[in-house]
């Protein structure tokens, strides 16, 4: 969880 919503 550090780019879009992963």
From Swiss-Prot:
Q: What is its main location?
A: secreted
List residues traversing the bilayer.
Answer: none
Q: Name one GO biological process term.
A: neuropeptide signaling pathway
Say if the entry is tagged with keyword Chaperone: no
Its GO CC terms are:
extracellular region
- Which cellular compartments is it found in? Secreted
Keyword annotations for this protein, in alphabetical order, are: Amidation, Neuropeptide, Secreted
Cysteines engaged in disulfide bonds, as pairs: none
Q: Does the keyword Ribosomal protein apply?
A: no
Q: Which residues carry this modification: Phenylalanine amide?
A: 6
| Superkingdom assignment | Eukaryota
Would you identify the family this protein belongs to, as annotated? Belongs to the FARP (FMRFamide related peptide) family.
Protein name stated in the entry? FMRFamide-like neuropeptide GNFFRF-amide
Q: Can you name the source organism?
A: Moniezia expansa
């Amino acid at each position: 969880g550090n780019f879009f919503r992963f």
